[in-house]
Amino acid sequence: MLTQIVNGKILTPQGWMKNGSVILRDNKILEVTNCDLAIIGANLVDARGMYVVPGCIEMHVHGGGGRDFQEGTEEAFRTAIQAHMKYGTTSIYPTLSSSTVPMIQKAVRTCERLMCEPNSPVLGLHLEGHYLNPRKAGAQMPEWIKNPDPNEYIPIVENSPCLKRWDAAPEMPGAIQFGRYCAEKGILPSIAHTAAEYEDVMAGFKAGFTHVTHFYNAMPGFHQKREYKYEGTVESVYLIDDMTVEVVADGIHVPPTILRMCYKIKGVERMALITDALAVAAAEGDAQAFDSRVVIEDGVCKLSDRSALAGSIATSDRLIRTAVQMADIPLADAVRMCSETPARIMGVLDRKGTLEHGKDADVLILDDKLKVRCVWAMGEIVENTLF
């Protein structure tokens, strides 16, 4: 079946295109063209002058719709995924906070079942813990944090083909070996919940830690010890040009001014936007976080003792609005940081992330307030308030 989207401002890799068409055939993009003549037999969609952009790739998200991926059940996974898809997420990496091995194994089984389904939005599993620095635990369960142990992580990796990313603090004993092993297995090791200094960050980068989890959160910046000043993890990451970062762009985890600074230094190709959302995101009624220590206050998730932020209640469309409306980032770049850049970081840019011939038919229509009006995921409409 052919679908032709016309009369929109289309975001292509070369920039904005007006008076063109995005043509979908089944689950693929057949063509993006500057011709808007109606195709005989195609389902014609009038974008009404709105923005036609690639679907968002959520590379760090813990839940939504009242359910958490840490539950590990198929029902929880499906509910959370569907909740985020309504707001522009067309591909997703379900994320687990620090967990026990049985919890990881349960989530792996569920993730692999869903990935095997036709046109699945699930691209793989992301483990945020549990090889973290306990001094930077944040909202992670402290009793589950430990040093990397090859007797534990090797069997997990060997039995988890869905595992695409695993975070760790590079300064912890055994972390460099862990990062090198993950990189060799095609799993992205990412720096997270860390007190790493420059030497630690550089050693991690050389071992395969090429990405940084929720940049600025749960890591130190510039600081002083007695009368002397030292760089923190943040400055160390800025000094490594090829290291990519992700930022929670809800306008709360990172101030808009810092969001803009990160964009100016790292650039659109090395900076992704994430929600780091918990179960309460896109949820109805009085939904609660999976972790009983978490409360919702001031539009964000916090530990009940207010010692740390615990995650967001954001969806992908909010990331775009925050970047544009609060951080003064051009819309095209804000969208790219939710689509093209995550695809590049996770190694799926050959089939995701941009509106180009042959890529998966993941398309959004955004109105002038940057609200989602229509979502196609693999060619199927999953949200529509446009027609």
Predicted feature descriptions by range:
Residues 15-24:
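A conserved glycine-rich beta-strand in the N-terminal activation segment of trypsin-fold
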Residues 62, 78-107, 120-133, 160-171, ...:
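Divalent metal-dependent hydrolysis catalytic cores, especially in the metallo-beta-lactamase
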Residues 82-93, 133-160, 203-244, 284-309, ...:
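Active-site gating loops and adjacent loop-to-helix segments of metal-dependent hydrolytic enzymes
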Residues 127, 182, 212, 323, ...:
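Conserved, mostly hydrophobic/aromatic
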Residues 158-283:
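Active-site core of metal-dependent hydrolases
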Residues 229-247, 263-275, 280-366:
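His/Asp/Glu-enriched, well-ordered alpha-helical/loop segment
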